[in-house]
């Protein structure tokens, strides 16, 4: 055995900062700080002490959450009078100061040979027991059997050692958790949420048997997955690392998604300006008009994929001119007469190009690189693939603002039609409601695939990341039916999909505005800067419970953007849950996330099934 790697020897060599003081308990240990360590930064440091329990040597680790100083002589009324006169009293001031810290125990290991097993602090060690600072060497020795599973997102808060974390896939086996769990990342804009989420995605991307799906309302993850340059100081080469891991990556934009439901067609047509230019404002009448038109077109066995053709539009236009159809959405003769007047005056070709095509292109199947939502989901959840993919669905709508690529005119027109005066491309219709409808369609499909796999006794082993979760599943009642339906699906998914091997990673700017039922289902939390005041802090306090010292330490986090330059920014996080081998007691841990991509890559020699693929 190499004595340099012997834990006893490593602890002896570690810096001693204090001893166990009084009072102490099995949850919090008082630290009497030694004179040489008084001027060191100790808050946030990871510390360790040895003690004997059940005839086995144990090692207890925890973070120092508070340091206090007391001088009883300075509290004496007579001394206070002297201090007021002189400022200090040499025999008393400074020399009689006593410094104490509070150490919250997060993990305890029992040593048996070179095997270290999780244990508990079942007794309080004697006063005077030495307490040492933890080093990377000590952690490596303690966690040596699990070194391949360890992943690093940053360093211990305000310190140098790397904080070991682990992200296991949701399947069975030696590196699997055996079940899915849900994660949440919370913090203000600029707190480092997105960068942390990308690093976590890369941690899960190491597993070929695990699929990853990112629902991206802002388009940020899509840019990273494509390898495009992104704004910000932390430029993580995500696509390059994924290629090293041999993880298949696919990015789908709005123009790549083929919608495949008649109810979606009716809802999107309702949202579009189509009926508005026929004098039907938003409301019940327009909804009835969209629904009856979709129903009649479906009755005529017109495939959704062909609705963009001019001849199919002509059928739809003809249907709207029929009185029995108009009576469905306008009961009064006066209203029908007004509609008929607008209908007869309308420029049919303009309606086709400006208002019909942008909607119906969403359902067109021969768009270059396009795929049905149903096919996309089957690709993600195909469990027998040797390497399951990371799929990003870009719902930002950036691609929808531009015209589609020029397409073969024979696909737009029937042979007997002359295409000379007709458009050969059209922008896609897009707004926030369409985004919600597509998200709802995706979530419905995910839930069905999960239920199907569960009936076959198979685990999906999939993580779904969803950004802007506070907007999609708010605590307050949404103001329209689409938002209500989407929120309901997300709440149900958080409650039920874990048993299917389907986990969720929710990213939110706020904690108090995300629906309580989703928060209650989360197992792992990451809290960045920005939740230290008002309703956010109250919501955070409810989750952390009675750990007031941990909350006080969280409130010390500084705004990353208050730094003098980008290189010195600190992205601090508090984490709760079974995400670290140093926190099986559920105690909060604090760390500073990497602010340099090279540091991240150096700390994590990313591995896949075949071994180490990236050591740079």
Predicted segment positions?
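Conserved P-loop NTPase motor module
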Residues: 565-616
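Glycine-rich phosphate-binding loop of nucleotide-binding enzymes
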Residues: 153-251, 538, 542, 594-596, ...
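Conserved P-loop NTPase motor cores
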Residues: 426-551
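Basic- and hydrophobic-enriched, low-structure N-terminal and domain-boundary segments
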Residues: 1-184, 200, 458-460
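Extended hydrophobic secondary-structure segments that form protein cores and membrane-embedded regions
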Residues: 183-187, 213-216, 390-394, 461-468, ...
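Conserved nucleotide-binding/hydrolysis micro-motifs of P-loop NTPases
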Residues: 109, 218-222, 397-400, 470-471, ...
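Helical/strand "switch-coupling" subdomains that flank nucleotide/phosphate-binding cores, especially
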Residues: 242-372
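Conserved helicase/translocase P-loop NTPase motor core
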Residues: 360-462, 472-483
């Amino acid at each position: 055995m190499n004595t340099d790697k012997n834990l006893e020897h490593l602890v002896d060599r570690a810096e001693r900062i204090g001893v166990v003081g009084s009072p102490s308990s099995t949850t919090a240990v008082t630290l009497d700080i030694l004179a040489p360590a008084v001027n060191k930064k100790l808050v946030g440091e990871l510390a360790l002490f040895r003690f004997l329990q059940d005839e086995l040597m144990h090692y207890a680790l925890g973070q120092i959450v508070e340091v206090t100083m007391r001088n009883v002589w300075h509290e004496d009324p007579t001394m206070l009078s002297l201090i007021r006169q002189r400022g200090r009293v040499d025999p008393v001031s400074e020399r009689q100061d006593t410094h104490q810290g509070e150490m919250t125990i997060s993990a305890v290991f029992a040593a048996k040979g070179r095997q270290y097993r999780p244990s508990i602090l079942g007794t309080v060690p004697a006063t005077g027991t030495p307490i040492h600072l933890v080093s990377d060497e000590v952690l490596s020795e303690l966690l040596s059997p699990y070194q391949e599973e360890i992943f690093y997102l940053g360093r211990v808060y305000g310190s140098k050692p790397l904080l070991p974390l682990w992200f296991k896939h949701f399947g069975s086996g030696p590196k699997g958790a055996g079940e899915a769990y849900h994660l949440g990342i919370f913090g203000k804009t600029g707190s480092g949420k997105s960068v942390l989420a990308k690093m976590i995605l890369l941690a899960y991307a190491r597993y070929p048997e695990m699929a990853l799906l990112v629902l991206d309302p802002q388009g940020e993850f899509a840019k990273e997955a494509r390898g495009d340059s992104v704004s910000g100081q932390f430029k993580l080469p995500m696509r390059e690392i994924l290629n090293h891991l041999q993880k298949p990556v696919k990015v789908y934009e709005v123009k790549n998604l083929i919608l495949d439901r008649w109810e979606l067609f009716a809802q999107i047509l309702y949202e579009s300006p189509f009926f508005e230019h026929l004098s039907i404002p938003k409301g019940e009448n327009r909804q009835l008009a969209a629904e009856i038109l979709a129903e009649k077109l479906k009755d005529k066995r017109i495939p959704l994929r062909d609705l963009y053709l001019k001849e199919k539009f002509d059928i739809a236009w003809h249907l709207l001119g029929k009185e029995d159809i108009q009576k469905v959405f306008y009961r009064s003769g006066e209203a029908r007469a007004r509609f008929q007047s607008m209908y007869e005056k309308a420029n049919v070709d303009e309606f086709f190009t400006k208002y019909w095509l942008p909607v119906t292109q969403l359902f067109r199947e021969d768009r270059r690189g396009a795929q049905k939502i149903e096919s996309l989901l089957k690709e993600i959840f195909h469990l027998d693939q040797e390497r399951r993919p990371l799929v990003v669905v870009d719902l930002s709508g950036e691609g929808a603002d531009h015209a589609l690529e020029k397409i073969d005119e024979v696909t737009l027109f029937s042979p007997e039609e002359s295409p000379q005066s007709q458009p050969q491309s059209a922008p896609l219709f897009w707004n926030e409601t369409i985004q919600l409808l597509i998200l709802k369609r995706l979530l419905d499909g995910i839930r069905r695939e999960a239920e199907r796999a569960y009936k076959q006794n198979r685990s999906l082993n999939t993580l779904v990341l969803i950004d802007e979760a506070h907007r999609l599943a708010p605590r307050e009642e949404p103001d329209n039916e689409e938002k209500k339906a989407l929120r309901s699906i997300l709440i149900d998914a958080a409650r039920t999909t874990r048993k299917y091997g389907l986990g969720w990673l929710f990213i939110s700017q706020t904690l108090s505005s995300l629906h309580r039922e989703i928060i209650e289902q989360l197992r792992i939390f990451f809290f960045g800067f920005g939740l230290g005041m008002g309703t956010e802090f109250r919501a955070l306090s409810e989750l952390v419970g009675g750990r007031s010292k941990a909350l006080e330490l969280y409130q010390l986090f500084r705004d990353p953007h208050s730094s003098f330059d980008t290189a010195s920014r600190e992205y601090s996080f508090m984490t709760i849950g079974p995400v670290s081998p140093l926190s099986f007691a559920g105690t909060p841990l604090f760390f500073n996330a990497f602010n340099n991509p090279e540091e991240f890559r150096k700390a994590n020699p990313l591995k896949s099934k075949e071994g180490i693929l990236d050591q740079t």
